[in-house]
Amino acid sequence: MGEPFVGTEAIASGRMTAYQLRSRCVAIYPGIYVPRDTALTAKARAKAAWLWSDRRGVIAGRSAAALLGSKWLEAGHPAELIHDNRRPPNGIRTRIDHVEDDEVTVLSGMRVTTPARTALDLARRYPVDEAVALIDALANATHVKMADVELLVDRYRGRRGIKSARTALDLVDAGAESPRESWLRLLAVRAGFPRPRTQVPVHDEYGVLVGVFDMAWEDVKVAADYEGDQHRTDRRRFNRDIHKAETVTGMRWTHIRVTSMDREADVIKRIAAAGVPRT
């Protein structure tokens, strides 16, 4: 994949002519180009936005999460910067915000908010459910400790969004391996069920690993998995799922398999019917 670059710098260095720039590349932000066949990612947008800022902005929010290794980030979202330009082009969101030196790291020469500061920004600037899914993915990728994020919550006590940030951070679980796993866990918790443990291994009587549940209430031997399209289209995974379901049923587990076709109310009924008590 072609990396974003500053058009005038490419011409000045002799890397390409003005004609080649116009004919072979496309501007994604003013003055910032990529080769025409480039499939933009969230990481590429983040770098392009940083270049647009004359390399002065601090990459933040979703863009920081992308550079820090988070999965499941759609390329179509605007890049996010902490930067003093209040009139960014389409595709970039800027905000003027205070950021301490210990809240910034450097990745490939770019200033990026640390995992803890990124988690705080996501928690205070997005709706709770969306923030939880984003921070789940960030925590899964970076192993950021919520205690470190809480220190920043205390640092910025009284700032806008801190109250909702506390709500989101209390619901985060780094064990979620997809946004829909986050959704399923939040659905269960909000329905009044105890918070499940995530990524729970289950072994047979010989100690052989049968599989790993997305989440489980081990005291009542109830587990839930969210099964996306890959569970159906990947034949090897499909076969593993069948084997796991048959084996754990024989071990007296209740295994709840959830797909995009399931209604929320029905999922809640299935969890309750399986014997998970409400708190």
Name each model-derived stretch.
Residues 1-163, 179, 277-279:
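Short gly/ser-rich loop at a beta-strand->alpha-helix junction or flexible surface loop bordering the NTP-binding
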Residues 7-11, 15-17, 55, 96, ...:
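Surface segments flanking catalytic/ligand-binding clefts of nucleic-acid enzymes
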